[in-house]
């Protein structure tokens, strides 16, 4: 009988190799996801800072609150980072709420 196919041992070896590859790649994906969320939050902070500066230029140096930026159309919605933390303006500085 000359049947073509894989033996159980060959299948187990392939599954073992796939398992090892998954164990190597999953932590890297998680690490990159955290980095992406951090960079996204930094980008949002920089955007709000730029909009604050534009508001100050348009309103004779008046320091805006986040509500001012939203009501005037500088920021369209609540500033929330990809990780769920909110952007706040305190004392004229843009910060991430902890």
Curated annotation (Swiss-Prot):
Keyword entries, A-Z: Cell membrane, Competence, Disulfide bond, Fimbrium, Membrane, Methylation, Transmembrane, Transmembrane helix, Transport
Highest taxon of the lineage: Bacteria
One of the protein's GO biological processes: establishment of competence for transformation
Positions of the propeptide segment: 1-5
Gene3D superfamilies assigned: Glycoprotein, Type 4 Pilin (3.30.700.10)
Residue ranges of the region described as May be involved in polymerization of ComGC: 4-29
GO cellular component: cell surface; pilus; plasma membrane
InterPro entries reported in the protein's UniProt record: ComGC, N_methyl_site, Pilin-like
Residue spans crossing the bilayer: 6-26
Post-translational modification: Processing of ComGC in competent cells requires ComC, while stabilization, possibly by formation of a disulfide bond, requires BdbC and BdbD.
Assembly: The transformation pili are flexible filaments, consisting mainly of the major pilin ComGC and smaller amounts of the minor pilins, including at least ComGD, ComGF and ComGG. Homodimer. Forms higher-order multimers. Interacts with ComGG; the interaction is probably direct.
NCBIfam families: IV_pilin_GFxxxE, pilin_ComGC
Similarity-based family: Belongs to the ComGC family.
Full protein name: Competence protein ComGC
Organism: Bacillus subtilis (strain 168)
């Amino acid at each position: 009988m000359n049947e073509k196919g894989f033996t159980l041992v060959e299948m187990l070896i392939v599954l073992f190799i796939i398992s090892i590859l998954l164990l190597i790649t999953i932590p890297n994906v998680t690490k990159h996801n955290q980095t992406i969320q951090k960079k996204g939050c930094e980008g949002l902070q920089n955007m709000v800072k730029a909009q604050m500066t534009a508001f100050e230029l348009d309103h004779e140096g008046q320091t805006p609150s986040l509500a001012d930026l939203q009501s005037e159309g500088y920021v369209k919605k609540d500033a929330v980072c990809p990780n769920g933390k909110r952007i706040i303006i305190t004392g004229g500085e843009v910060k991430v709420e902890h």
